[in-house]
């Protein structure tokens, strides 16, 4: 592993090999997003909660650069692509909206791309080509690449899990340094996927639905299955204002501090 890549991955993942990243890049695709009406104010609070880092757009990285201009600043991962129009039978259209060079210039620690895979083969080929191009540039700059394989249109279930696991393997083969993917539903599949890929696997949260208890149980199971951490945004900051900061702290303690699922549930019940 090159020195620059090793250094940046060492910032993203703690000595325990884990990370807790809070995404705030949703406005890049969704525009106005509930819970993220003032991302700068949210970030100002979130920085003090113990999160290892944040996933953000180029514009947000530029606007909040001063928040990270100190020695112990959290890491930042730059979202370099976006997807528009994906709904029902429309696979949508994806495009690069930032670059590896932008991440280097702004002092970020990694770049992230989407990998929608329940799409026509021509779009799969274009996606693979786009990821390979970013990986090539990132390798030259020794910049880690996070890839997010996702079934955009399939309902949650075994078929979507199969698509995302299949795409995760392809992402690794394309050179991804980190795979961000949905929890596959049970610890056995999670462990098998982590063993197969051989690169850190971090779990996304998905749409801001479901219960806090369900989220905590999912995170606990994912970590038990070998996940190297979580990259969860909406299911945290779309909670009630009284809850989301306590939830973020509890997730940090689950990832790094050995807090069990049941203990985390107790913490949140006390906070509520």
Predicted features and spans:
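Alpha/beta enzyme core
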Residues: 14, 19-62, 66-71, 75-85, ...
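Thr-Gly-centered strand-to-loop micro-motif
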Residues: 204-205, 232
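Nucleotide/phosphate-binding sheet-loop regions of phosphoryl- and nucleotidyl-transfer enzymes
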Residues: 245
